[in-house]
Amino acid sequence: MISTSEFKKGLKIEYKGEPYEIIDFQHVKMQQRAPIVRTKIKHLKTGRVLEENFPAGEKFEKPELEEKQMQYLYSQGDSYVFMDMESYEQISIPKERIGDAIYYIKDEMIVDVIYYKGEPLVIEPPMFVELRVAETEPAFKGDTASGGTKPAKLETGLTVKVPFHIQTGDLLKIDTRTGEYIEKVKE
């Protein structure tokens, strides 16, 4: 059982018989009332985000989630095909279920696929990925004085803010949790 005092971002709970992930939470103590925990939770099957208030100390079941390592093979229409690294079984996962994780996945990349009751729910790419810059504006002399950033479109379609010295073709390290540029990878 998971208590509201153990809440943290990314924690998965079972609420009303369904799996949810905690996106954000805040402990609130109101005058002359019992404390509550304001929580934003995301339904792992539908992706719908709810805002719920739970009494402090309420307990939740931990959902029975299974994690499998799978290799991304290719996209086929509106779905993506992954291969189980143990059984070599191939599964097709709809685009809606993958969400923004698709921006961090390249061909043949190993990802974690979270299953709930035998059904694939969520794709979790590695914490950091290396992606190549597909296009970005060239740097102009004098741009570096302000230490600003410019947008860069990566090979997967993701757009990130990068320093001015980054050029098209550079390999970048990206944090998949925030979608932010970390550093230029030396090749």
Swiss-Prot record:
Share an example GO biological-process annotation for this protein. Answer: peptide biosynthetic process
The protein's UniProt keywords, in alphabetical order, are:
Cytoplasm, Elongation factor, Protein biosynthesis
Name the domain of life.
Bacteria
- In its keyword annotation, does this UniProt entry include Cytoplasm? yes
**Coiled-coil ranges per UniProt:** none
Q: Which PROSITE patterns match?
A: EFP (PS01275)
Q: Which SMART domains match?
A: EFP, Elong-fact-P_C
Q: In which pathway does it act?
A: Protein biosynthesis; polypeptide chain elongation
This protein's major location comes to: cytoplasm
Tagged with keyword Protein biosynthesis: yes
A GO molecular-function annotation: translation elongation factor activity
Name the Pfam families for this protein. Answer: EFP, EFP_N, Elong-fact-P_C
Q: Where in the cell is it found?
A: Cytoplasm
Q: Which GO terms describe its cellular component?
A: cytoplasm
Signal sequence, renumbered to the chain: none
Q: Which NCBIfam families match?
A: efp, PRK00529.1
Listed PANTHER family:
ELONGATION FACTOR P (PTHR30053), ELONGATION FACTOR P (EF-P) FAMILY PROTEIN (PTHR30053:SF12)
The entry sums up its family as follows:
Belongs to the elongation factor P family.
HAMAP family per the record?
EF_P
Q: What does this protein do?
A: Involved in peptide bond synthesis. Stimulates efficient translation and peptide-bond synthesis on native or reconstituted 70S ribosomes in vitro. Probably functions indirectly by altering the affinity of the ribosome for aminoacyl-tRNA, thus increasing their reactivity as acceptors for peptidyl transferase.
UniProt protein name:
Elongation factor P
